[in-house]
Amino acid sequence: MMTAALRARHGPARFNLVQLCRGACTLTALLAEGLPLMTTFFQRAVSVACVAAMLASGATPLVQAQVNLPALGDTASDDFNLGTERKLGDQIMREIRRDPDYIDDPLLLEYVQSLWQPLLAAARQRGEITAEVDQRFAWEPFLVRDRSVNAFALPGGYIGVHLGLIAMTATRDELASVLAHEMSHVTQRHIARSIANSKKQSLISAAALILGVLAASRSRSTDAANAVITGSQAAAIQGQLNFSRDMEREADRVGFSVMTSAGFSAGGMAAMFEKLDTASRFNDAGGFPYLRSHPLTTERIGEARARAGSVSGSGLGSGFSATEQAAPPTVLEHSLAQARARVLMDTRVDALRRWQALDSQTDADIAGQPLHEKLGNACASALASTLLREWARADKSLLRAQALIQFNPRAFAQADSRAERAVALLHAQSQLERGNTARAVEVLEPYESSVAAVNTSRPVLLMSARIALSEGLPAALNLPRLTRSAEALQTWVSVNRLDAEAWSSLGQVWGALNQPLRALRADAEARYALGDWVGAMDRLRAGQRLAKRTAASSTAATAANADFIEASVIDSRLRDIEAQRKALSAEEQRAG
């Protein structure tokens, strides 16, 4: 990914995202369950945050730690308002986006968004999201490269999804049920309710849990953290487990209504619960952190089955087994997303070899497999071979996938067109990785035949930019491609202003088109979106210096006018980011 290079330049986040996700899951559930379940990392983070929280509340900690935290409030009576919650979420996400385990895979993210957006629309239509909450919160899902089965909600409407969760779900409805559940934790404001329903010590625990990850990134003093871990455990909320279970049941109920209103199968939630319950009984090696933060009970499973059975036309009776439901129409697309997640969640060589080995199956071996399983296995093997740079085996699996499309036209005609497009994008990726740019263009061209089509497909947009930036095409052919990519990317980021990958691609395209001022501005926006505000300001100041030199030496009026407009934008953005950074510093000083 292009943003990986940006992260490498300004350094990764100073905490481990996988540990955060495994330890945090949903912050509300940890509030209820207390601290003993946390990882060593999160214990350290919570301890440091507790020091600051106790200082703010007037308590005397065992060790004074010099840490700066965003101001949450001095007393438990302070309202944990929408602005505060969003601000905390934004600050956490600025760190998460810089972590190596944060993954922006365009195909997988587009698939998750294709489930998320109908859920969000249904929640709005049902009145689960008030106008103020809708406007204030981010409503943004993101992906985490981790094999464990997990999803979690953060303050401000951010939802994390582990690739391991996508990899183990059999249908889009199962995955949608988890997204709907996590969305409901946000819409019902469970984090804020946990704080509001507690005493002052509960606020300390809340501050520790929500802000601990930020404290850990700002403090290197583990001695201070260890000195107060016992105290922080004692200060944690007691007797809240029943309340947490009420929250889980509420999220189940609201989430079920939202997902069915969005058009997903009523059996999806029950199917997911049954799958998690069965898997956890046979595997208790820590691969299912979702169950630690969202404890499944017989009651919750029974309620999910009862809700599914009560939906008119669901065909669910007392003998219903959720896994026996017919596959939804978009099963091909889900199978491709599942296969991609399985490969990308663990890119170590041994893991890739296991998925690559699927290409050894003969036609007789797969004769009884359903189409979606055959296609998923072929694409998993092709992607694994591509990452291993073993092109002959990649071609073998790609040919099998293409043959499945060719000989099953009716199935693909009925499926979402994104399934066939996903295979083409994988093919283009494989060709590009081996330096065959001309072949990559040939494969992708049907899907980028118009600017409008490119603008509606982020994966095609970014792949087109990668092709334009690669070597291997004559300049006469590549210049129009670069120009089209610049126009399409500029249109995209004007709407999706925090798309770091798109901004990074745009910066490189402008550089290739000999537009250094625009390239600097785009690079600055990419850094800003990743949470590197200092790097963003550095790029913007470099743009200001370049604009002054250009204005002094320019002889072409049109070029000068264009540079003046871009320079004005750079000046404005620099003022905005400086003001945001100043406000954040002021909050840290108030809490320090």
Located regions from the model:
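Active-site scaffold of zinc-dependent metalloenzymes
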Residues: D146-R172, R189
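Extracytoplasmic and endomembrane cell-envelope/extracellular-matrix remodeling and assembly machinery
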Residues: D74-T75, Y102, E110, E128, ...
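Catalytic Zn2+-binding segment of zinc metalloproteases
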Residues: D173, M183-K199
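Hydrophobic or amphipathic, alpha-helical segments that drive membrane association/targeting
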Residues: T28, E33-A45, A49-F152, A279-R281, ...
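N-terminal secretory signal peptides that target proteins for export/translocation
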Residues: M1-F42
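Acidic/histidine metal-binding catalytic segments
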Residues: L108, I195-A207, A224-A227, G263-F273
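Membrane-active amphipathic alpha-helices enriched in small hydrophobic residues
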Residues: L203-R218, A227-A235
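Short alpha-helical catalytic segment bearing the HExxH-like zincin motif
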Residues: G160, E174-E182
